[in-house]
From Swiss-Prot:
Function: Catalyzes the conversion of uridine into uridine monophosphate and cytidine into cytidine monophosphate in the pyrimidine salvage pathway.
UniProt enzyme class: transferase
Gene name per UniProt: udkB
This protein's GO CC annotations: cytoplasm
Lineage of the species this protein comes from: Eukaryota, Amoebozoa, Evosea, Eumycetozoa, Dictyostelia
UniProt-annotated binding residues for ATP: 22-29
UniProt-recorded name of the protein: Uridine-cytidine kinase B
Catalysed conversion reaction: uridine + ATP = UMP + ADP + H(+); cytidine + ATP = CMP + ADP + H(+)
Gene3D superfamilies: P-loop containing nucleotide triphosphate hydrolases
Length: 243
């Protein structure tokens, strides 16, 4: 999870939630980073769906090479749905920490609350209706399959110590079928589609303008409600005094 704080702004307990999805290595995280960078005067957190993987059983760990991490069953949907719902309701939450080496959920969690914007990203961020209902805007990062494959190969070899053969096997057996069967169909739920991912600066700028506008509207409404409460309180006090 990434977090950026600015202490010079007032905050709302009901954050603006942005869902970001797309295929593996499509540039989801980079798009989120660019949005975060441009909204520098806000408190922002990036939550990754990867944090909500189910811990593998002993049997699954023994055959981890054939475990499908791109299938919906790999995620704890109840946990992630409750987390997003609580955030939307203005509650503080604890985000789990998933260890990719042991394929287990660690005891330590990451606390989160009182933010202006939540960027929730992952390959299946739009998978359930309950998740989609919590989102104020839904973004699909649309990058061609050749680019995604080349990025995945370079990333997994460099960062995860995998062989080229192993990466290609996993891609053909799990990653590509999961994209076709589960990820691509959620594209229809997107409010905004970003072709070419983070390279599409114009699209990201337009999205940030829209988000800034919506946040300004929320802030204006919050202030007006506060003013109404103050005025209402004054009127009540006045009537009591006259009595």
């Amino acid at each position: 999870m990434k977090y950026m704080e600015n202490n010079n702004t007032s905050h709302s307990k009901h954050p603006f939630i942005i869902g970001v999805t797309g295929g593996t290595a499509s540039g989801k995280t980079t798009v989120c980073d660019e949005i975060m960078k441009r909204l520098e005067n806000k408190r922002i957190a990036i939550i990754c769906l990867d944090s909500f993987y189910r811990p593998l059983s002993k049997e699954d760990r023994e055959t981890v090479a054939s475990y499908n991490f791109d299938h919906p069953d790999a995620f704890d949907w109840s946990l992630v749905e409750n987390a997003l719902r609580d955030l939307k309701d203005g509650k503080d939450i604890e985000i789990p920490t998933y260890c990719f080496k042991s394929h287990s959920r660690l005891e330590e969690t990451v606390g989160l609350g009182d933010v202006d914007v939540i960027l929730f990203e992952g390959i299946l961020s739009f998978y359930t209706q309950s998740l989609r209902e919590q989102m104020d805007i839904k973004i699909f990062v649309d990058t061609d399959s050749d680019t995604r494959l080349s990025r995945r190969v370079m990333r997994d070899i460099a960062e995860r110590g995998r062989s080229l053969e192993g990466v290609l096997y996993q891609y053909e057996k799990f990653v590509k079928p999961a994209f076709d069967d589960y990820i691509l169909p959620t594209k229809k739920h997107a409010d905004v589609i970003i072709p070419r991912g983070a390279d599409n600066v114009v699209a990201i700028d337009l999205i940030v303008q829209h988000i800034s506008s919506k946040l300004s509207e929320k802030e204006s409404f919050r202030k007006s409600q506060g003013q109404l409460n103050v005025n209402g309180g004054s009127n009540t006090a006045s009537s009591v005094n006259h009595a």
